[in-house]
Structure formats: structure tokens, C-alpha cells
Amino acid sequence: EMQRSLVGSEMCIRDRYRSGDGRNHSQSGYEYLKNEAHISDDEILNCVRYHHGMYLKNASLAEDDKAYVVYYADNVAAFSDRREAEAGEGGFDKAMPLESVFNILNGNHGQSHYAMQVLNPKNEINYPTEDEISMDEHFYQSVIQNITDNLKGITLDEEYINSLLAVLEANLTYIPSSTSKKELADISLYDHMKMTAAVASCVMQFLTAKGEKNYKQSLFINAEKSYDEEMFLLYSMDISGIQSFIYTIGEKGALKGLRARSFYLEIMMEHIVDELLEKLSLSRANLIYTGGGHCYLLLANTDDTRDILAVSYTHLRAHETTLHL
């Protein structure tokens, strides 16, 4: 339920603002979801309208409104992806493209950025370039239209959360989460939204386990104290025995065999992750990374989570072959 509210709440609110709508993105996003996406769920609408403190403090909301959870999660996600640039200046630039994360890696000072695109398997890989690029309102408007069209076939419930995530990934991967001139713009809007959803779902599970129902008190009034609480677990899995599994094949049809076994490993890890997330009542928003026989998940630091992880691990170990988890 939390992820349904959160993913729906963050939906393209910044795109709406950057497409030429001059209002603040909280109000703009609220009206978009209500009037154009025809979302009538007050829980989702409140999460959009009041996800910034300046609006939340004057809102007449119940103490257990999930807008407080979204506000808190948005701040936590922003702490990790909003970093000031060395020569940053004030103001915002709505035409700012997404920068490459490799610009500052290992002490680099690159100027590469990505072309404005949506994900499309027919397109060539969108490699970063130093050619002059700027986002335009037409692109943002087309992204909003894409998302609006896709929403018509999606029900905002737990069965469609992963589908909604896929829609957002396709449209928001090359859009920066922040266009502040004083900050680095190398985190996509999709990644910020996804991380906000992951954090929010963990916070909800953590507070529920504690029996805490006054979200206003714990996450808004006493937010600074809550930031020090150990609410999260970073959980990783690794498949060992990959090399011997992949390369113990005969010469005949070797290339096809390598591809088949590599694909098998990828699908196996994806299946394990999906099964685990379902048991934990989470979505793929909580999957930080998967690939090469590894994965990382953001989970709630609760006894229930630890118990589920222990049981799942025991079951998986009981069915091991030459591959070990």
C-alpha cells in the first residue's frame, strides 16, 4: 500500500513543472494527477501536494497520513543524491541535461552528459557526450504524454507496481532529478523516485514494527532524531561457482552454451529476488542492483525481515547444486 501511494505520488511532478508549468512542482504535480491522470485517491494526492516541509507544516492532515512518510523518505533520498558542484552557482536551469556519474569518478573533472531520450530497444545506446545538449519543453511534454497514456492501462495497486516502475524507468532514466545550478546533476529522476519509494516502504515497516502510528511526530516534528535511527538493512546476495558452471561445456556449440548458461544465471537471480521481495511485502523499488550473480536490496531493519531472510536462505541452501548462494 505504501509503495502504491509513493510511486504514484512522485509520478512526473518535476516533468510537469519543467514542461512550462510555472507553478511549484508540488502543486503542479497534484493537479496533474487529479485532473489529467484522473487519480482520486487522497492518500496519493496528499503525498504529492505536501512532500515538501514548507507546505506540509501548514497542512491539515491526520497524524498517520503517509505524506509525512513521503516527506521523510524524499529527504533521505535527497541526502544521498544531492551534492554541491565545486563551482556551483545559484538558481535553476530547466534545460539542464543529465550528467554522467563518471564526470567526478576517481577525481575526474569531466563535462559529459546524456542526450534527451526515452528508453527504446530500437535506439542505439545513449552514450554520454560533451556535445552541447539541453532539455527542452517539448521533450518534457512528450514524456508526460507517454506516462499519461501508460497510466490508462495501469491500476495503482500492488499487482501493477512493478509495471509502473518500468514505465517510469523508460521515460525518466535520462532526466536529472535536480536542475539546481549549484548541485551535480548526475542522478536521474527515475533513480531518485525509486530510492524514495524504497526508503518510504522500509520506514513504514520499521514504524509498524515499533507500533508507532504518529508519523507527524516521529518523521516531521522529530525528524532530526529519526535520521539517527537504524531503520534500514543493506542486504546482498552472491552466487558462487559461476565460473565452473559456465565454462564446463564442450567445444560443440560452445558460444550458444555460454549464452544459455549466462542467461540461466541471470534469470535465477531475478527469480530469487522477486520471490524474496514478495515475502517481504516489497517491490522492485527496493532492488538497488542485480547483475553478474550479485544483488543488493534495501530492506527494513525489523525482526520480521530478519526472520524471513533466515528462512529463505535456509530453503535456498537446501536446493543448491554446483552453484552456491
Predicted regions and their residues:
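Catalytic-site or vestigial catalytic-site microsegments of nucleotide-handling domains
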Residues: Y235-S244
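Surface-exposed, low-hydrophobicity interaction/linker segments
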Residues: K252-L280
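Divalent metal-dependent catalytic cores for phosphoryl transfer on phosphate-bearing substrates
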Residues: E1, S5-I125, I175-T179, Y227, ...
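Extended, charge-enriched "interface" segments that sit outside catalytic cores
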Residues: N123-S177
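Alpha-helical phosphate/pyrophosphate-handling elements in metalloenzyme active cores
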Residues: E1, S28-I39, Y190-L219
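Extended charged low-complexity segments that act as oligomerization/scaffolding linkers
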Residues: K34, H38, D42-L61, A67, ...
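Residue-level detector of conserved catalytic or cofactor/ligand-binding positions
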Residues: M2, L6-V7, I13-D15, V311, ...
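Phosphate/oxyanion-binding active-site loops and adjacent basic polyanion-contact surfaces
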Residues: G22-H25, S188-T196, L258-M269, L309
